């Protein structure tokens, strides 16, 4: 029997294995939701995230015809409250099931994206397991956090781009930026990748597939340089049809969602869902290195210059990453997300899920072995986080004044994040998402998706 026929025969069993993973993951999440209901009723420490209570209260207000922003600390899109209105008349755990379903959808999208790039099934399975069986990710949805919905939309946008569905990608991108502001950082790399040598009218973009060689051999310096984006080429086709269409549709959807929300909820929506996230200063302890400065000077208003300076590290790193890696789109937005969280003015644990959903998509192109280098990075990152949490526990639950050691722990956490990020970049095999149509002769050699 030929190898092709053997691979064809193996496909049903491979699909069954992946489906079994999804079924087991679903049962695990259902169990955690049911267990969470029991823990909330019988134990002092609640399983349910405090944010879920805020979401549910806002949804209840919306269901009764009032503004969800009457609920203090609700600072999200009205769409979230709308999605959770069944909490009021169906069951209070409706939202948890919705978020957990989105969590499973993320796993399915990860598998789909990797298969589209011809990653072997075994590697696909391991990559999906990094998401589905990560204790942090399978608890965040079951505890009632909405981030899995955002992750699912972002992966769907990537999948739409890979399939050449620019209209869908633009629509969902405008929607996800309205739903959660932070994906706005992906606008520039997406626009840059919509090159006329990649997206041509009437043609599906050709993907650059995974191959065995790139899993074993690190990229040379010359190869890395070829992946730096050619600025001159960009300027020549800056206003291409695809870029203009994507910008107009995504911008139109974003503005339309905001206009409808503003029509119903006015300045409350504008301030709580949008402006608040741009000017947020949190005096409570969090992972950010800025928290101590904000805590010491919270009584006074920060000047515009001080607020701008706090954004400069983020802007600088973002532009540098986009310039270097935009053609390797998935890797670029992963790096952007990690850097955005690392240098943000406020960092909470739920933000980590923003890049957890992208991590499985870059693993097949990484040369970092779990033993020892990968293990070292994991220990360093978790160790720095645990060290911070110990000081946070002393402050929060014991009432001990440990603000200075806690700030030092934040500095160490920043250093750990930076070290791990640099190692990931160094051990990554740079691979553009799309092949470029250099000429009519070379286009005949482009391997298109089956």
From Swiss-Prot:
<feature type="transmembrane region" description="Helical">
    <location>
        <begin position="149"/>
        <end position="169"/>
    </location>
</feature>
<comment type="function">
    <text>Mannosyltransferase involved in glycosylphosphatidylinositol-anchor biosynthesis. Transfers the first alpha-1,4-mannose to GlcN-acyl-PI during GPI precursor assembly.</text>
</comment>
<feature type="transmembrane region" description="Helical">
    <location>
        <begin position="94"/>
        <end position="114"/>
    </location>
</feature>
<feature type="topological domain" description="Lumenal">
    <location>
        <begin position="396"/>
        <end position="401"/>
    </location>
</feature>
<feature type="topological domain" description="Lumenal">
    <location>
        <begin position="42"/>
        <end position="93"/>
    </location>
</feature>
<feature type="transmembrane region" description="Helical">
    <location>
        <begin position="174"/>
        <end position="194"/>
    </location>
</feature>
<feature type="transmembrane region" description="Helical">
    <location>
        <begin position="21"/>
        <end position="41"/>
    </location>
</feature>
<feature type="transmembrane region" description="Helical">
    <location>
        <begin position="346"/>
        <end position="366"/>
    </location>
</feature>
<comment type="pathway">
    <text>Glycolipid biosynthesis; glycosylphosphatidylinositol-anchor biosynthesis.</text>
</comment>
<feature type="transmembrane region" description="Helical">
    <location>
        <begin position="315"/>
        <end position="335"/>
    </location>
</feature>
<dbReference type="Pfam" id="PF05007">
    <property type="entry name" value="Mannosyl_trans"/>
</dbReference>
<feature type="transmembrane region" description="Helical">
    <location>
        <begin position="402"/>
        <end position="422"/>
    </location>
</feature>
<feature type="topological domain" description="Cytoplasmic">
    <location>
        <begin position="423"/>
        <end position="450"/>
    </location>
</feature>
<feature type="topological domain" description="Lumenal">
    <location>
        <begin position="195"/>
        <end position="243"/>
    </location>
</feature>
<dbReference type="InterPro" id="IPR007704">
    <property type="entry name" value="PIG-M"/>
</dbReference>
<feature type="topological domain" description="Lumenal">
    <location>
        <begin position="336"/>
        <end position="345"/>
    </location>
</feature>
<dbReference type="GO" id="GO:0051751">
    <property type="term" value="F:alpha-1,4-mannosyltransferase activity"/>
</dbReference>
<keyword id="KW-0472">Membrane</keyword>
<feature type="transmembrane region" description="Helical">
    <location>
        <begin position="122"/>
        <end position="142"/>
    </location>
</feature>
<dbReference type="GO" id="GO:0005789">
    <property type="term" value="C:endoplasmic reticulum membrane"/>
</dbReference>
<feature type="topological domain" description="Cytoplasmic">
    <location>
        <begin position="367"/>
        <end position="374"/>
    </location>
</feature>
<keyword id="KW-0812">Transmembrane</keyword>
<feature type="topological domain" description="Cytoplasmic">
    <location>
        <begin position="1"/>
        <end position="20"/>
    </location>
</feature>
<feature type="topological domain" description="Cytoplasmic">
    <location>
        <begin position="265"/>
        <end position="314"/>
    </location>
</feature>
<keyword id="KW-1133">Transmembrane helix</keyword>
<dbReference type="GO" id="GO:0004376">
    <property type="term" value="F:glycolipid mannosyltransferase activity"/>
</dbReference>
<protein>
    <recommendedName>
        <fullName>GPI mannosyltransferase 1</fullName>
        <ecNumber>2.4.1.-</ecNumber>
    </recommendedName>
</protein>
<feature type="topological domain" description="Lumenal">
    <location>
        <begin position="143"/>
        <end position="148"/>
    </location>
</feature>
<dbReference type="GO" id="GO:0006506">
    <property type="term" value="P:GPI anchor biosynthetic process"/>
</dbReference>
<feature type="topological domain" description="Cytoplasmic">
    <location>
        <begin position="115"/>
        <end position="121"/>
    </location>
</feature>
<keyword id="KW-0328">Glycosyltransferase</keyword>
<feature type="transmembrane region" description="Helical">
    <location>
        <begin position="375"/>
        <end position="395"/>
    </location>
</feature>
<feature type="topological domain" description="Cytoplasmic">
    <location>
        <begin position="170"/>
        <end position="173"/>
    </location>
</feature>
<feature type="transmembrane region" description="Helical">
    <location>
        <begin position="244"/>
        <end position="264"/>
    </location>
</feature>
<comment type="similarity">
    <text>Belongs to the PIGM family.</text>
</comment>
<keyword id="KW-0337">GPI-anchor biosynthesis</keyword>
<keyword id="KW-0808">Transferase</keyword>
<keyword id="KW-0256">Endoplasmic reticulum</keyword>
């Amino acid at each position: 029997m030929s190898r092709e026929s053997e691979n064809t025969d193996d496909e049903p069993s491979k699909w069954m294995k992946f489906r079994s993973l999804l079924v087991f993951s679903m049962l695990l999440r259902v169990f955690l939701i049911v267990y969470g209901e029991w823990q909330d009723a019988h134990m002092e420490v609640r399983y349910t995230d405090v944010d879920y209570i805020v979401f549910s209260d806002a949804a209840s207000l919306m269901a009764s015809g009032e503004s969800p922003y009457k609920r203090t600390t609700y600072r999200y899109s009205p769409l979230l409250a709308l999605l959770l209105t069944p909490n009021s008349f169906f069951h209070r755990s409706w939202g948890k099931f919705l978020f957990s379903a989105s969590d499973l959808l993320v796993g399915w999208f990860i598998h789909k994206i990797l298969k589209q790039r011809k990653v072997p099934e075994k590697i696909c399975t391991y990559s999906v397991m990094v998401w589905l069986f990560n204790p942090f990710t399978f608890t965040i949805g079951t505890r009632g956090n909405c981030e899995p919905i955002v992750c699912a939309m972002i992966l769907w946008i990537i999948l739409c781009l890979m399939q050449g569905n620019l209209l869908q990608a633009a629509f969902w991108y405008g929607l996800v930026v309205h739903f959660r502001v932070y994906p706005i950082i992906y606008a520039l790399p997406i626009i840059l990748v919509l090159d006329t040598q990649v997206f041509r009218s009437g043609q599906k973009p050709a993907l650059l597939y995974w191959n065995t060689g790139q899993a074993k051999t690190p990229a040379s310096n010359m190869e890395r340089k070829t992946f730096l984006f050619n600025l001159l080429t960009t300027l020549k086709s800056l206003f291409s049809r695809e870029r203009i269409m994507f910008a107009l549709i995504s911008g139109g959807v974003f503005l339309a969602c905001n206009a409808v929300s503003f029509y119903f909820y006015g300045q409350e929506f504008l301030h709580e869902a949008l402006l608040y996230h741009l000017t947020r200063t949190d005096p409570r302890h969090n992972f950010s290195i800025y928290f101590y400065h904000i805590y010491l000077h919270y009584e006074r208003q920060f000047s515009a210059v001080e607020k701008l300076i706090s954004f400069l590290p983020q802007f600088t790193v973002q532009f540098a990453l986009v310039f270097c890696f935009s053609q390797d789109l998935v890797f670029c937005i992963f790096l952007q997300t990690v850097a955005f969280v690392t240098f943000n003015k406020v960092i909470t644990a739920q933000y980590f899920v923003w890049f957890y959903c992208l991590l499985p998509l870059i693993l097949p192109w990484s040369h970092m072995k779990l033993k020892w280098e990968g293990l070292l990075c994991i220990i360093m990152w978790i160790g720095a986080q645990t060290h911070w949490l110990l000081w946070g526990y002393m402050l929060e639950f014991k009432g001990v004044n440990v603000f200075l050691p806690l700030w030092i722990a934040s500095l160490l956490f920043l250093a750990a994040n930076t070290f791990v990020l640099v190692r990931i970049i160094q051990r990554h095999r740079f691979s553009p998402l799309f092949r470029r149509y250099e000429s009519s002769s070379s286009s005949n050699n482009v391997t298109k998706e089956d």
